[in-house]
A protein has these predicted regions:
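Macromolecular interaction modules
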Residues: 1-153
Length: 153
């Protein structure tokens, strides 16, 4: 680790660089919720719910076969499910050196709200990823974000 340069880095420690290749599978529009009791500008609001998977590879598994399964089998499965339940963004990142990294990859799924994630879990079909993923060492983060845009006068 490096010495933190600011308070954010201090609280986000430990930080480590991670070289990945990103695949933007779905890049839909962020849902905007217009204001109802006053004029829409100079302020707009939007929000979303995001699920992030830091995916660990099972010991002894070939990362090339894993990435092939992820892109050619799992991605279509997730994309179809995301489209069916109203998800609007799906991004996959693969480690450039999975043999020396804690995680082989990362997946980010974006929904307008947490109910989209609930519907996703009810609809996703199992696929070949189960043969590669070390679920005990995979981490999952759930985040809600609200953004307020204020137009300068």
């Amino acid at each position: 680790g490096e010495v933190p340069a600011d308070s954010f880095q201090e609280r986000a420690a430990p930080y480590w660089p991670w070289a990945t290749r990103e695949y933007v599978i779905m890049d839909g529009a962020l849902p905007l919720n217009p204001l109802t009791l006053n004029p829409p500008f100079p302020c707009t609001r939007s929000g979303f719910f995001k699920v992030t998977f830091l995916v660990a590879l099972k010991a002894g598994k070939d990362s090339g076969e894993f990435f092939d399964c992820w892109l050619n089998e799992h991605v279509p499965n997730v994309r179809n499910t995301m489209e069916a339940v109203g998800g609007f963004r799906y991004v996959v990142s693969h480690s450039l050196d999975p043999s020396s990294e804690t995680y082989a990859g990362m997946a980010e799924l974006y929904f307008p709200d947490p109910s989209g994630w609930d519907r996703y879990r009810d609809h996703i079909e199992p696929d070949g990823m189960k043969n590669f993923v070390d679920y005990d060492n995979t981490d999952v983060f759930y985040t809600g974000t609200e953004m307020v845009g204020i137009e300068a006068p």
